[in-house]
């Protein structure tokens, strides 16, 4: 843990308080990539039966639960320490080790972790039906709720895919 703390402090110092994160690519076996997330065309299906890469996660301290073959660091953002990218440490570890110094007193005192992340979805077709529970329901199984919002910037969507719509279930 001492080496991780040294790397975390070094990254924070080198960036003058800004952490440089490596890209975090996440495959999904139940979706097909729309090929708009600026990944090399040869790399969308590099993980074979685990699925095509159709998500890029940002500032993530959340493990991607993708079944039994999921690597222990899938979905987790790495802080890059050196220019060559050889020295790196998980953002999750940086937050755990440096606490309020890196995420501020308000978030640290309330959550004692980094409680959010962003992602680019890039699906060729519509997402399958799924649900994200609120905290009150997720807490029953020892999990946190997952509030979501969707934004479709035209600069990153040069075409709409096969079905450029999304549906939301609303409880008025």
Which role fits each region the language model picked out?
Residues 1-172:
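Transition-metal
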């Amino acid at each position: 843990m001492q080496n991780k703390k040294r790397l975390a402090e070094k990254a924070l110092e080198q960036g003058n308080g800004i952490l440089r994160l490596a890209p975090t690519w996440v495959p999904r076996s139940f979706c097909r990539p729309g090929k708009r997330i600026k990944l090399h065309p040869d790399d969308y299906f590099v993980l074979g039966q685990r699925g095509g890469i159709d998500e890029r996660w940002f500032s993530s301290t959340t493990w991607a639960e993708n079944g039994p073959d999921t690597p222990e660091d899938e979905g987790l953002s790495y802080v890059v320490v050196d220019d060559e990218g050889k020295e790196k440490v998980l953002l999750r570890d940086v937050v755990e080790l440096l606490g309020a110094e890196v995420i501020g007193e308000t978030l640290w005192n309330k959550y004692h972790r980094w409680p959010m992340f962003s992602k680019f979805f890039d699906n060729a077709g519509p997402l399958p039906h799924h649900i994200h529970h609120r905290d009150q329901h997720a807490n029953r199984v020892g999990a946190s709720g997952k509030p979501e919002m969707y934004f479709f910037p035209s600069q990153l969507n040069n075409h709409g895919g096969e079905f450029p719509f999304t549906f939301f279930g609303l409880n008025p």
